[in-house]
Amino acid sequence: MGLRIHFVVDPHGWCCMGLIVFVWLYNFFLIPKIVLFPHYEEGHIPGILIIIFYGIAMFCLVALVRASITDPGRLPENPKIPHGEREFWELCNKCNLMRPKRSHHCSRCGHCVRRMDHHCPWINNCVGEDNHWLFLQLCFYTELLTCYALMFSFCHYYYFLPLKKRNLDLFVVRHELAIMRLAAFMGITMLVGITGLFYTQLIGIITDTTSIEKMSNCCEEISRPRKPWQQTFSEVFGTRWKILWFIPFRRRQPLRVPYHFANHV
């Protein structure tokens, strides 16, 4: 199965994603420059903490890029419907194409997406069956990176010994306080937002319910048998190997269940 690149032409989405990239670049370059490397050179922290910071940052960036360009599960114009599954398909009243039940038509993208959770402007893409796992990784690594940066910002002023060597000729050193205050503001704002989003995503997977289904209150009308959380997460990530749930570099295998997901909207 070839790699399907999905690119949404949406200026609003570009602006939102550009803001996320700016915050990532701000932390990626300035936190090590102001905090990590100076304290490492004076023996206050081990080098492994710097490696961990860059590792988390790279995992976060890979998850962001892949979540934004991966096809979320767009349906082809002439899908081949297995004969035994025709009863689980329906006609979309917006694009007049057949789709599996639990699919949704995205008005911003202009097409139907399999098991669509929501359209996220922060990645300028829909979150659907084929990229939901990457969106979860993005939430996880963004929260981890934000906590890591905030922790070292706090330690820089209130825990670590004062730096003995400071090159005041450098712009980042002369304006360190303003830079760190902005980093703390962005970090706290990001942490609050991403924590709420990540929590709702986890609850949705555990209960096998998409965000669109929650908003439409359709779940109250459906007698949906509860699945074990391991099964629901395995369906999203495409593997039962839990260690692979944290790796954004791999290829996700298609779900080994029918297109329609037996419990549907």
UniProtKB/Swiss-Prot annotation:
State which Enzyme Commission number(s) the record gives: 2.3.1.225
Tell me what topology the record assigns in the membrane: Multi-pass membrane protein
Specify one Pfam family: DHHC
BP GO terms, sorted = adrenergic receptor signaling pathway; peptidyl-L-cysteine S-palmitoylation; protein targeting to membrane; regulation of establishment of endothelial barrier; regulation of leukocyte adhesion to arterial endothelial cell; regulation of vascular associated smooth muscle contraction
Where is it mostly found?
Golgi
Question: PROSITE patterns this protein is in?
Answer: DHHC
User: Residues in domain DHHC?
Assistant: 90-140
Disulfide linkage: none
Where are the membrane-spanning stretches?
17-37, 45-65, 134-154, 186-206
Q: Give the family this protein belongs to, as stated in its UniProt record.
A: Belongs to the DHHC palmitoyltransferase family.
Role this protein plays: Palmitoyltransferase that catalyzes the addition of palmitate onto various protein substrates. Palmitoylates sex steroid hormone receptors, including ESR1, PGR and AR, thereby regulating their targeting to the plasma membrane. This affects rapid intracellular signaling by sex hormones via ERK and AKT kinases and the generation of cAMP, but does not affect that mediated by their nuclear receptor. Palmitoylates FYN, regulates its localization in hair follicles and plays a key role in epidermal homeostasis and hair follicle differentiation.
The domain comment in this protein's record states: The DHHC domain is required for palmitoyltransferase activity.
What is the protein's name according to its record?
Answer: Palmitoyltransferase ZDHHC21
Q: Which organism is it from?
A: Bos taurus (Bovine)
Please spell out the taxonomic lineage of the organism that makes this protein.
Answer: Eukaryota, Metazoa, Chordata, Craniata, Vertebrata
